[in-house]
Amino acid sequence: MPQRTYMVVDPRRDHSFRVPRPDLAVTLGTPEPCTQCHTDRDVQWDAAEISNRFPDSRADTPHFATLFSAASRGDASAQAGLVMLADDSGVPAIVRSSAMEHLTLIAGKLESGTVSRWLTDPNSLVRGAAVA
């Protein structure tokens, strides 16, 4: 893989920070790293290649980017999913706090119990997002 520098100081020869998700590239327009090098291929090729090489991959599972995209478009139907994501201690704190940030784009008032859960979270990033 060709080297790419992230944040000015972090040269890498990998796919970046996440596993390629050609399905999200098609539905949300997210960057698709495989076809940046394999310029003679398209996203459909990438999807088939990942499926063939990694049959047990989680590439078909729901991804938080779908909720974030919906909230960014003002789609209030994402609210319940964002609250569930923010409550899920099994996902990274940055994702949880980002879910809270996206809630501000679409939510009216949240139940005080919801916010108070986040204010007492062990992670400072989550607590900080709850205050904002």
What are the roles of these predicted feature ranges?
Residues 63-74, 94-108, 114-117, 127-132:
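Structural detector for internal amphipathic alpha-helices that build alpha-solenoid repeat scaffolds
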Residues 38-41, 89, 107:
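Sec/Tat-exported extracytoplasmic proteins
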Residues 1-68, 73:
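Sequence context surrounding c-type heme c attachment/ligation sites in exported
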Residues 76-87, 108-120:
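Amphipathic alpha-helical scaffolding segments comprising HEAT/armadillo-like alpha-solenoid repeats
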